């Protein structure tokens, strides 16, 4: 079966808890059994707080709304905090997962989010306003989102780098 993704852009919804939700992909999957085929759906979503918090979830079910709800719930449970600097990243970083590699670079104010599909959804929900990204290798939405999150979680703040080197933050930023 061919993979199907929702082609229409999804607005980042805000529910009563103040979190932004975005659907990245929905795939129709089939299980072949003795009596025929069983159709199902797999949803991939990201949730963020608009201030550096982001989580990813996937859900599977026989119906789309149930799969999406399961994915949203998992994304809320897996929310992680990433330190940002003036709406962009602290430094350039490469994230990897499987065959997907994602190169992320901070950008000056006013640049906007220059990123494709799944990466853009991650940055929009977490509150990044200026970033430049390039996806290398696999374009599988799940692997691209995981690679993006792996890279973001590996970002070090100037204070962390200074502590590792035994220097002050002013010496690091020089």
Swiss-Prot record:
GO BP terms:
translation
**Recorded superkingdom:** Bacteria
GO MF: rRNA binding; structural constituent of ribosome
Q: Which keywords are on file for this protein?
A: Ribonucleoprotein, Ribosomal protein, RNA-binding, rRNA-binding
Q: Which GO terms describe its cellular component?
A: small ribosomal subunit
- The answer to whether keyword rRNA-binding applies is yes
* Residue ranges of coiled coil: none
NCBIfam families given in the database record = rpsE_bact
What function does the entry list? Answer: With S4 and S12 plays an important role in translational accuracy.
Comment on protein domains? The N-terminal domain interacts with the head of the 30S subunit; the C-terminal domain interacts with the body and contacts protein S4. The interaction surface between S4 and S5 is involved in control of translational fidelity.
Q: How does it assemble?
A: Part of the 30S ribosomal subunit. Contacts proteins S4 and S8.
The UniProt entry's sequence similarity note says: Belongs to the universal ribosomal protein uS5 family.
**Protein's name according to its UniProt entry:** Small ribosomal subunit protein uS5
């Amino acid at each position: 079966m061919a993979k199907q993704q929702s082609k229409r852009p999804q607005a980042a919804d805000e529910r009563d808890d103040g979190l932004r939700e975005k659907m990245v992909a929905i795939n129709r999957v089939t299980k072949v059994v003795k009596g025929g085929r069983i159709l199902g759906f797999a949803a991939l979503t990201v949730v963020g707080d608009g201030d550096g918090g982001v989580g990813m979830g996937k859900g599977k079910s026989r119906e789309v709304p149930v799969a999406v709800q399961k994915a949203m719930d998992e994304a809320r449970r897996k929310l992680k905090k990433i330190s940002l600097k003036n709406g962009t990243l602290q430094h350039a970083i490469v994230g990897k997962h499987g065959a997907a590699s994602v190169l992320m670079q901070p950008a000056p104010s006013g640049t906007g989010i220059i990123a494709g599909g799944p990466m853009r959804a991650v940055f929009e929900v977490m509150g990044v306003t200026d970033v430049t990204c390039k996806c290398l290798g696999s374009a599988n939405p799940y692997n691209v989102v995981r690679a993006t999150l792996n890279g973001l979680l590996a970002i070090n703040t100037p204070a962390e780098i200074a502590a590792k080197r035994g220097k002050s933050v002013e010496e690091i930023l020089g």
